Amino acid sequence: MPLTLSTGKHDMTLDPVWTNAAGMLGFSNEARDLVDLSRLGAMVTNPVSLAPRSPARGPRMLEFPGGFLLHTGHPNPGLTEVLRRHRRRWARMPCPVIVHLLAQTPEEVGRMAERLEAVEEVAAIELGLGETDPQTVAAMVTAAGASQRPIIAHLPLGSGAQLAQAAARAGAAAIALGAPRGALPDPGGAIVHGRLYGHAMLPTALQAVTQLARLVDCPLIAGGGITSRQAAEAMLAAGAAAIQFDSVLWTEPEAVLESPTA
């Protein structure tokens, strides 16, 4: 069944109850030839920072059994340029647009959220959060409330229940769980840090959803290792209210873009 996120002033409904994960499909319609965006409940943009960010140096992708590590540095031209290039495209998108914000401080979050409040093409904000402490999570989510759009607090798998609970208490409309952090040696032996993707993430993700569904008072959006309809159905049965698909959209989108049994 559809999922509606509301702040009292702005509502967003996910129907169907899945989106892409941030970083998978670009900033607007760049991946339209890869994925039929009308089959998503919403499209989540690549991470957007206040100032421009350059690509990471060194290896971008390292494989391991069951998945791969991705190290990009979240390159983007900054919020002002993203709005200039993509706002008109968002207005023509076949599904709602969720802007994923990448910020270092609550002040940065507040500045970006306030800017997005005036952008009617944005249905909600997803706030990327790292493995930090509950006080920082609460401050970041509170600052994002300057937009009065529904706020989705995005946490990496393995962050712990305290961070999810802090985000919910601070006003997050939903908690999204996504790619955990990890590290691998590159061919030269240097340690590369990044996000982990692939079906090997599924057991960890399913365990996290099962536990958090009992502990937080807002909807959970499950992500990590979901590469089949069966995995999506398992997440919903475990207590997730919606799903985020990541690398499967690059390789086999048809495997997941069917309606799971809610």
Please report, for each region that a protein language model flagged, where it lies by residue.
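N-terminal capping/small domains of soluble enzymes
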Residues: M1-P94
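Hydrophobic faces of well-ordered beta-strands that scaffold small-molecule active sites
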Residues: P16-A22, G41-T45, V97-L101, A123-L127, ...
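Catalytic cores of alpha/beta
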Residues: N29-V35, V109-A118, G158-G171, Q211-A222, ...
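Acidic (Asp/Glu)-rich catalytic clusters
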Residues: V35-S38, R85-P94, A113-E121, M140-A146, ...
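Glycine-rich phosphate-binding active-site loops on the catalytic face of alpha/beta enzymes
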Residues: T45-L50, A123-E131, A174-P185, G225-S259
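Active-site beta->alpha loop and helix N-cap motifs at the rims of alpha/beta catalytic domains
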Residues: P65-Q135
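Alpha-helix-loop-beta-strand connector modules within alpha/beta enzyme cores
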Residues: L69-P96, V137-S159, H193-L220, E258-A262
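Glycine/Thr-rich beta-alpha phosphate-binding loop at enzyme active sites
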Residues: L129-T136, L163-R214, C218, E252-E258
